[in-house]
Structure formats: structure tokens, C-alpha cells
Amino acid sequence: MNRGRGGFRGGRGGRTGPSQFQQGPPDTVLEMGAFMQACEGDIVCRSINVKIPYFNAPIYLENKTQIGKVDEILGPLNEVFFTIKPSEGVKADSFKEGDKFFIGPDKLLPLERFLPKPKEVGPKPKRKSGGAGGASRGGFGGRGGARGGFGGRGGARGGFGGRGGSRGGFSGGRGGSRGGFGGRGGSRGGFGGSRGGRGGRF
């Protein structure tokens, strides 16, 4: 996993938390998101938690019934959205707008983990001369990486990312806003697009 400027590269399959083999629900759960709409079988949520969920973190109802796992994290750092891949037998369109989903407190990361670190005050270390193929701009990877958020695999810098084209989202076309969260390749476009199409407009 490569971490870009204050974020992760890779809209999916990132960190899953310290315990990948947890059995049963946690002792307590915290509010994580509110249902917005179903999109191609997934649940699209607006985050109502100040922290960022782990990828693949289990998501529960208030009664601790697991309904799926975090699939993708999207949007700018000050307005985070995420999708849930429903568990077998759970229908994304069975929920209504405003329904809340919950997460275990051990599956959250502080937002500060994804913000740029302050510049160090003091003399700069001397660079060694010579050598081919040095690190670029601090050695944080190339195009498609995150700048202040989650960057997608070959996707946009921030903004909303998707899987090979429009899949319903908020911003379309190439790129998106810097300092956000992206998915896998391409742009997730405006909510209500079809996979492989062009992204929507604001």
C-alpha cells in the first residue's frame, strides 16, 4: 500500500484494520453513515462520523446485525461518502434515505492521518549527488495517487473515482477536486450513470 500526500492510493482493498478475523459483532457500535441511495447493488452512504472507516470494515445496523462491508471511500476530506457491499441476502434498495449504519470503534482512523504533514522547520538535509531514477517529489508515487485524500488506481486526483467509468456519483470527467477520495480508475461521475459511461456534471 502506498500512501500519497495525506491519504491512500487505491480505492479498494486497502487497510482492513488490526483484526481481520473478528468473529461476531463488537461490544459497542458507533454511527458511521446515513443511507443515500442504492447504486448497482451497492449502498451509497454519507459519512456522519468524524473518522474514516477501514476498507472492508464490517457495517452493522443499530442492533449489531451485519449488513455488509465498506467497499469504497469517496469525496473530499470535508464531506466523505462511502459505499457498502451488502452481505448475501441483503438488498441495497431495501433501505430508505436517512437510515443509519454503524461500525465498530476499532475500525476507524482519525482524519488527521490523511492530512498533509506540516513542514519541518530547520536546515534541509544535503542531497546526495548522482544516482539515476531518484524519488519524485518526496517519493510518494506517480499519477493517480492521492493528494490530501484517497486516490484511485489510475483514477482521479481526489474527487469521486469509479471502476472504469461512470457508476453514479457526484463529479464526472477526468480528475475531480484535489484533496478527496477516489475509486478504481476513471471517474464515478454523477449518481445515476451506467458503468463504463461518461461521468456526470455538477
Curated annotation (Swiss-Prot):
* Region described as RGG-box 2: 137-200
Q: Which UniProt keywords apply?
A: Nucleus, Repeat, Ribonucleoprotein, Ribosome biogenesis, RNA-binding, rRNA processing
* SUPFAM superfamilies xrefs: Translation proteins
Instruction: List localization entries.
Output: Nucleus, Nucleolus
Keyword Nucleus annotated: yes
- Provide a Gene Ontology MF annotation, just one: box H/ACA snoRNA binding
Q: Which Gene Ontology cellular-component terms appear in the entry?
A: box H/ACA snoRNP complex
Q: Does the keyword rRNA processing apply?
A: yes
Which ranges are annotated Gly residues under compositional bias? 1-16, 130-202
Which residue stretches does the UniProt record annotate as biased composition, category Basic and acidic residues? 114-123
Query: Where does the record place the region Disordered?
Result: 1-26, 113-202
What is stated as this protein's family in its record?
Answer: Belongs to the GAR1 family.
Q: What is this protein's function per UniProt?
A: Non-catalytic component of the H/ACA small nucleolar ribonucleoprotein (H/ACA snoRNP), which catalyzes pseudouridylation of rRNA and is required for ribosome biogenesis. This involves the isomerization of uridine such that the ribose is subsequently attached to C5, instead of the normal N1. Pseudouridine ('psi') residues may serve to stabilize the conformation of rRNAs. The H/ACA snoRNP complex also mediates pseudouridylation of other types of RNAs. The H/ACA snoRNP complex mediates pseudouridylation at position 93 in U2 snRNA.
Q: What is this protein called?
A: H/ACA ribonucleoprotein complex subunit GAR1
| Native source species | Scheffersomyces stipitis (strain ATCC 58785 / CBS 6054 / NBRC 10063 / NRRL Y-11545)
